[in-house]
Amino acid sequence: MMGLGFVPIFSLALLVSISSAEISNKVGINYGQLGNNLPSPSESVELIKSLKAKRVKIYDANPHILKSLKDTDIQVSIMVPNELIENISKSQSLSDQWVKTNVVPYYPDVKIRYLLVGNEILTNPDSGTWFNLVPAMRRIKASLKTHKIKKIKVGTPSAINVLESSFPPSNGTFRADISGPVIKPMLQFLDRTKSFFFIDVYPYFAWADNQQNINLDYALFKAGNITYTDPGSNLTYTNLLDQMLDAVAFAMKRLGYPDVRIFIAETGWPNDGDIDQVGANIYNSATFNRNVIKKLTTKPAIGTPARPGWVIPSIIFSLYNENQKPGPGTERHFGLFYPNGTKIYEVDFSGDTPLSGYKKPLPAPTNNEPYKGKIWCMVAKAVNKTAVGDALSYACSQGNKTCDAIQPGKECYKPDSLFWHASYAFSSYWAQFKKSGGTCSFNGLATMTPQDPSFGHCKFPAVTL
């Protein structure tokens, strides 16, 4: 819409009104399933309703979840698994069969509105799949047409790292390795089919990676008088999310597609994390989600500085804290509910509750400043014994005398316990390999502690922050 600067104000307003008329500003929830202790699909749908969420995105086409969503007014996004993209891109019959199996039995009783082909494919280092993505999207769209299904938009969610440059927003540029061969034909497809550019956008990570230059309140929509003016566009920003979204908008404009609409496929703020993950707490999580929902559901739509008045369909991440998600602790702590169905904090997806209307006070944040000191990596509570044994073997197989101290007769052999030995191995591995990318995760089996577990002559290696 930036190219319409010469259009009279009333005409611009009319164009925005027409382009947004059929797009709902209702906010949804991402329903991930990477947990071994999550409620049933039917219970989960009731929790989604309790949030007043009007959209839900799942990361597959789980039949039990889809059946539980039958006859609700919740708009549903389903997903083609990453591993099927290559085959679907080369076979219309396989695409037709996927739609026949995963869409036709449920539509229209389930309000499937978006069919997403893969998840963050362009972040995957396997670049071979990149070039199959748009062909697979075209085939899925053709399959929907074959089955006379017209109301489902086809797209694919991308991470913000599809951008090579994002600051200032007016300098937004797609990565050179994907811009021409993948993004441009994708935008052509999205423009032609009136679909969306789906983007996963997390101000938390942008802030956490650059705390020295980004004010926390600016990331949480609490900036007050804190603003940023883009020298290239002269647009003024009051929050970090708008900056990130406009970087995408400018990148699309740079490729000749200024009017492809943006859909926030994921955004959110972690309610907890590892000791070294600053700002991941309930207070910040609730503040961000409440504020972003209020912004996105405001009528008339606020949009962004580069796209004022544009509706931005959005889905918050995520429904649950998922205990089997790999990676650092924040990955397992984006939920609005604990796995037992208890709310972590109150949030109203309708946007009707004023920010002062949430009665239960939030716990004061204690980690908005980086932790300074030593940290050890230990086996987490209530984890699978077999999995711990496998992780111990992995840590010890990396060399560098990682596990010498827990060999028979050595200073850390006693007590002769799997969990003791694994905790030593985890700490030793992390201390040695953190600088080269090693983490204290071990597929969710490990946790960080500031308490020194050393005992007697056994000294556990530590990481110093």
Predicted regions span which residues?
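Substrate-binding cleft of extracellular glycoside hydrolase catalytic domains
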Residues: L66-L163, P168-S170, F174-I178, I264
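Substrate-binding and catalytic surfaces of secreted/luminal carbohydrate-active proteins
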Residues: R138-A142, T146, K150-G155, L163, ...
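Generic structural signal for hydrophobic
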Residues: L47-I48, S68-L69, Y106, L190, ...
